[in-house]
Amino acid sequence: MHYRAFYIFCWLSVTNIALGQKADLKIAPSVILKLISDLQSNNDTAFPNGGFVTFRKSNWSSQFKIDQNSFYTALILFNLNQYEAKMSKEDQYLLYQINQKAIPYFINFKNKNKPSYNFWPKYPPVIFPNGGWLNHFNASGALPDDIDDGSIIQLALKNNDNDSFAIALKHEFTLFVNTTTKTTKGFYSKYKNQKVYGTWLGNKMPVDIDMSVLCNTLLLSEIYQLPLNQIDSNTYNLLIQLVKDAKHLKDPSYVSPHYEKSAIILYHLSRLYKYSHYSLYKNIKNQIVQDAQMALSIAHFPLEKLLLQNTLLNLGEKGAYLLADNPFLLQQNNYSLFVANLATLLPNPFKRWVTKTKFFRYSYYCYPYNLSVWLENYYLNQP
């Protein structure tokens, strides 16, 4: 960890009277952005330059391992870049520096022959970095590129490229739609024949459908203002029906196996709502609001509360949704945004069985990402 970031950690700690209690001191957004900047890897031997360190933990171990992936660094850039116009000139310049350091980081995740990206490094391929015996399978077990990483990375890089890259990427997505070459065997039978986007961009993988991933994929089209095709409409309509059926509340780990939690699904739904131009999707706003308010009333973890507050703010619900707690609380690794889950590769009924046992499941944590969500909350509260 960089010494400057360590000093800020200490300062944030002493301002908090007791862990979990509200701090009287109001934290300026520039302090948080500076902390994020200081947590960005800078010629660190343990992590490539420009990225943000992420940790993973298996369900059967208490050990946290550094995981080099594209996803969290892209999420941080996307979260911050959305609110550049609301930042001070000094913070805008700092954000520019963060972006410039991060852009080269994505090169080793980019497919050299296609417009898509991978979760882990591709050249050479790596799975579960620092994974011990798992790394004997780096080549044979390498994952294909996927629509989730592709969408978020492309959104993170929006200010640094032109729309042609997004157009090419979306075309690549259409080649791996459910029922095109394969039909999903790990989703509700009621919807298994829906022509919607599959997570994996590879013919050797089973078709995986994830509610949150679908939100991110549609978000790419909405922010880049790409014309919606029939697959987009099908995907929107599936999301609408799943919300009406309350699958995100009753069955979150099945309907969104890469994210698993109701609060996180609601956050994805609300972020898509903020940018969406699909009129039928706008009609489910009230249900998402009610669901988020209910979830917030019973939320326990700081990041969980923050995501739900941001969900309501994305939906235009103004209120006391600013997390005034010390951001140091977000350093706790007690609520993961994303999981790597063997169950996503399995057909029914094995998918449900493995999901319940949490066998071969890894939770991912990234403190700089949590801080970017805190900043998102701050700026969503600004006029």
What kind of region is each of these model predictions?
Residues 1-23:
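Bacterial Sec-dependent N-terminal signal peptides
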Residues 21-383:
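Preference for long, amphipathic alpha-helical scaffolds in soluble/luminal domains
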